[in-house]
A protein has these predicted regions:
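Transmembrane beta-strand segments of Gram-negative outer membrane beta-barrel proteins
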Residues: 24-53, 163, 307, 343
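Residue-level signature of outer-membrane beta-barrel architecture
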Residues: 26-27, 69-72, 128-130, 187-190, ...
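Repeated loop/turn-to-beta-strand initiation elements of outer-membrane beta-barrel proteins
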Residues: 32, 75-78, 134-138, 192-197, ...
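Transmembrane beta-barrel strands of outer-membrane/channel proteins
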Residues: 36-42, 80-84, 140-144, 197-201, ...
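Surface-exposed loop and membrane-interface regions of Gram-negative outer-membrane beta-barrel proteins
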Residues: 44-62, 70-124, 135, 207-210, ...
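Residues that define the transmembrane beta-barrel architecture of outer-membrane proteins
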Residues: 56-64, 117-122, 178-182, 210-214, ...
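Surface-exposed coil loops of outer-membrane beta-barrel proteins
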Residues: 93-125, 132-217
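Outer-membrane beta-barrel "beta-signal"
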Residues: 293, 339, 359-371
Length: 371
């Protein structure tokens, strides 16, 4: 099947969803509901003459995720999410950069997930919620889960389908949060405080080793005259199953992240994400310093539109990268409550400890429908 045919079918589905979305019923019953997201993006990289092996070229991809929820009672829920995609965009090796220009779950990501021989089933879990006096709540989840559903959240920098596309501005790349494998999560909320913990067993890492992951997030919601602010601290650690640079021993991965977002009135918002990691194992980056501005379209009578401006600096680890820089800005135009179109511009630069540097621009267009 050609790339055109593999992409044209999801594009046709995108058109059909757009035509039917306003009339769709998402709650089949008061207990059963479904939803999903269908996106299509095309990105073109402009590298100039410095990297003739890669060159100026473009690629597209169309991911589709469908989810179903069954909640027999308000305290119990069964949930499953399936992922399909046509194409890998510039993530297929076309791009010379170490960071993925689009952090979406694309064609290669939904097949043989984590070396498990499982295709398309991203998450499947059961959750039970315990409610206590004094506005306390404890939710326990078990099954196939995604650590990023619980940890390293951010109101303005956490969604590759509606916000920034570059992986450094979606989550902390040095934070190694795993997705789509067996595990459990606990979420405790008390007034403005929350603690979330995740434990997972991941089938296979890049070294081919099975490993355990543990993460915990402490968060606080602050209400002020400026608006709502969310302040989070995240700790991550794995079992010692990651090869060191020499490939002679296995080590643990450890990291610490801070993820803050703060409203500045009705139009503006700001965010930062800082992170640090050990380099006992082979690591591309050891630290991250990123931040940006979110601007709502209320200022020009487009309240559902958004402008995002973000920058990230990643200090290299022990794999030969001195540092990586990424700048990204996007305009998201909301056509209606279901569909939006985004224009996206990225600049990336990988500075190496030895040898030349790689830099260039990536121009993108993204269409997204949520239902």
């Amino acid at each position: 099947m050609t790339m055109f045919n593999r992409i044209s079918l999801p594009v046709l589905l995108l058109v059909l969803v757009l035509k039917s979305a306003p009339a769709a019923s998402y709650e089949v019953t008061d207990k059963l509901s479904f939803g999903g997201i269908l996106a299509g993006a095309y990105q073109y990289q402009a590298l100039g003459d410095s990297l003739p092996k890669f060159g100026d070229t473009g690629r597209g991809a169309v991911p589709f995720q469908f989810e179903v929820s069954y909640a027999p009672t308000p305290s119990n829920e069964l949930f499953a999410k399936f992922g399909f995609a046509a194409g890998n965009g510039l993530n297929d090796g076309t791009s010379p950069f170490y960071l993925a220009p689009w952090a979406a779950t694309l064609e290669d990501d939904v097949k043989d997930i984590n070396g498990s021989n499982r295709d398309y089933l991203l998450t499947a879990w059961y959750k039970h919620i315990f409610t206590f006096a004094g506005e306390q709540q404890l939710a326990l989840t078990g099954g196939i889960i995604d650590a990023t559903d619980y940890l390293d959240e951010n109101a303005y920098s956490n969604d590759e389908y509606t916000q920034f596309m570059n992986e450094a501005l979606v989550n902390g790349p040095q934070g190694f949060l795993p997705s789509f494998d067996i595990g459990g999560a606990a979420e405790w909320e008390f007034n403005q405080f929350a603690i979330k913990g995740v434990a997972m067993n991941v089938e296979e890492n890049d070294d081919g080793n099975n490993f355990n992951y543990y993460g915990v997030q402490f968060s606080y919601v602050m209400e002020s005259g400026l608006g709502e602010g969310n302040y989070r601290a995240i700790f991550n650690i794995t079992s010692g199953d990651f090869l060191n640079l020499a490939g002679t021993e296995t080590e643990r991965l450890k990291s610490f992240l801070l993820s803050f977002d703060q409203e500045l009135g009705d139009i503006f918002g700001v965010w930062v994400r800082f992170g640090w990691a050990n380099d006992d194992a082979a690591r591309d980056w050891q630290s991250l310093y990123s931040g940006g501005i979110n601007i709502k379209g209320s200022g020009w009578q487009r309240p559902d539109d958004t402008i995002g401006i973000g920058y990230g600096f990643l200090d290299g680890g022990n794999m030969g990268i001195d540092n990586t820089q990424v700048f990204e800005t996007y305009y998201r135009y909301a056509v209606n409550e279901f569909f939006a179109a985004s224009a996206d511009i990225q600049y990336m630069k990988d500075s190496m400890e030895v040898g030349g540097n790689t830099d260039g621009w990536i121009l993108g267009v993204r269409l997204t429908t949520e239902f």
